[in-house]
Amino acid sequence: PLACAETMMESAAPIQVKNVPNCYRLSPKLYRSGQPGNDGFKALEKLGLKSVLNLREYHNDAGKAEHTGLRLYRMRLAAGKVTRKELMDCLLIISSAPKPILVHCWHGSDRTGIVCAAYRIVMQNWTSEKALEELMDERFGHHQSYYSNLAELIKNTDWQAFKEEFRKKQQAQGI
């Protein structure tokens, strides 16, 4: 069941992309950032990305990504109320989308951070402690004082059960 696992401990590498703030490569398949600006989506496509998962509640990427071949996905997350089910749905999108894929929110820190932490645990077999450490890494700008719920979600999730449920859902969807 772990045949699709990626490199276990590849660290996030900063990537300079025009009009894409807080951009990092987490693996050959996954990138993270803040909201891409004008021409940011074209620059991402030029970099070789195939898909974008937008985690913002009230902002759609369709206008700025127009005239690109990027596949756009959206999950409306509220940083103060992210649920286990929402993480599951995000990972199912990431696992089925053409890659590489970029995950972003407004700042690329809180919503993006929790989704990337779940990805690290489920897809790359990181420990929850290591994923939490990356979530809290000051490079990404996590707002711990506002969103302590995100660290609690990582700490309180039964990741073994989560992984089993994820694999079953993947199989059911033919991913």
Task: Please describe what each predicted stretch is.
Residues 105:
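Short cysteine clusters
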Residues 1-101, 114-175:
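Cys-dependent protein tyrosine phosphatase-like superfamily
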Residues 108:
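Substrate/cofactor-recognition hotspot
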Residues 111:
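Conserved lysine of the Walker
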